[in-house]
């Protein structure tokens, strides 16, 4: 027997070793021919790129190998499939009820794991409450605050058993009292949404409410302001299926049920302004209400109002003007306001680094709506700008 035959015969005594060796050799070869990706739509995250070795020092080498390890992890061939396989094992075999900071609830619903306020939120929440009370005091009788509850607050029975989630209701009640004491109106939509909880009012895989939920909240605002609601029967509803949202991007459960986005075919225009100083929009780009190209990518919800622009104006079919100060929950809400106002100005403080007083003085708004969901309200580091005078 030749030496080659002896080596082959010896290897056959270790079939598992042979299989694993061939597997890793094949994986290495596949990695070599697979092009790097800059972005993972499935995870909604940016992927690490191949690092460059710039310093031949101990610190430089350590930094390089740390970055290279992350690069290899992000760019491994079949990354999406490996993550899905991990999800199958953890949720099916190990019966995990959470993954990636997301609680896996009943009816295929996903909830963020929020057991209490973070230390940063303990500082931010009082500041944001104070900002809204200041706004209400500066514009008495004009400010309406609508705080959208989280899905876990409406669907408590679908949250995994014994999950000690934050008591959101108490904070709603505190904000309601503060706003009303300052001369504003608090639009409490919790009873309305609870009454419609058997309907499709929250996405299963995303942190937003659906367009239907936004419509019920909008209808309650109309009742508060004495307005006639947008007539859904008079408009064509369009849908886009296959939506996997932010919760899915973190949890990556193998059996997630995709969501459906609904929007109404409206001819109204949206102008996104460039702002150079407080209350001073300059050039603007005018387009439709929806960026329908987003429906072909992962983050389909970004199609509403073309995302979170600092200052934009929607041309409506009604009369008067309203200012909407918002987070992304308002993006599917604002189109309904076209039935009631001629101009709907929309401010997102994440991209609007100015106070409001000059903007309000220049435009003479009839009403001001502050629309946030509770999670972003307690954590938004920019909402304090609503309380800045000037």
Locations of regions flagged by a protein language model:
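Extracellular glycan-modifying ectodomains
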Residues: 1-390
């Amino acid at each position: 027997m030749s030496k080659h035959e002896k080596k082959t015969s010896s290897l056959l005594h270790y079939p598992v070793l042979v299989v694993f060796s061939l597997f890793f050799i094949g994986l290495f070869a596949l990695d070599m021919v697979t092009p790097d990706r800059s972005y993972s739509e499935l995870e909604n995250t940016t992927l690490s790129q191949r690092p460059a070795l710039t310093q031949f020092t101990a610190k430089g080498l350590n930094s390089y190998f740390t970055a290279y390890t992350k690069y290899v992890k992000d760019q491994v061939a079949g990354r999406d499939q490996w993550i899905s396989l991990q999800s199958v094992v953890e949720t099916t075999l190990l019966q995990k009820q959470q993954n990636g900071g997301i609680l896996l609830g009943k009816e295929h619903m996903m909830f963020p794991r929020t057991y209490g306020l973070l230390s940063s939120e303990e500082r931010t929440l009082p500041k944001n409450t104070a900002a809204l009370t200041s706004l209400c005091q500066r514009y008495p009788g004009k400010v309406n605050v609508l705080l959208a509850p989280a899905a876990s607050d409406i669907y408590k029975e679908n949250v995994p058993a014994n999950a000690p989630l934050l008591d959101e209701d108490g904070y709603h009640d505190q904000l309601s009292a503060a706003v009303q004491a300052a001369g504003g109106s608090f639009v409490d939509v919790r009873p309305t949404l609870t009454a419609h909880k058997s309907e499709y009012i929250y996405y299963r895989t995303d942190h937003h409410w659906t367009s239907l939920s936004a419509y019920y909240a909008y209808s309650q605002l109309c009742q508060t302001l004495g307005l006639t609601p947008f007539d859904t029967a008079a408009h064509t509803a369009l849908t886009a299926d296959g939506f996997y949202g932010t919760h899915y991007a973190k949890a990556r459960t193998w059996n997630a049920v995709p969501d459906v986005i609904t929007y109404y075919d409206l001819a109204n225009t949206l102008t996104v302004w460039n702002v150079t100083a407080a209350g001073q929009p300059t050039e603007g780009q005018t387009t439709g209400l929806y960026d329908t190209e987003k429906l072909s990518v992962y983050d389909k919800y970004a199609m509403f109002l073309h995302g979170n622009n600092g200052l934009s104006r929607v041309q409506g079919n009604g009369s008067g003007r309203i200012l909407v100060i918002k987070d992304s929950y308002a993006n599917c809400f604002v189109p309904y306001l076209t039935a009631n106002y001629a101009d709907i100005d929309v401010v997102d403080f994440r991209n609007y680094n100015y106070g409001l007083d000059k903007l309000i003085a220049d435009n003479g708004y009839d009403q001001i709506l502050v629309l946030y969901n509770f999670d972003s309200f307690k954590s938004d580091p920019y909402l304090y700008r609503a309380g800045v005078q000037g």
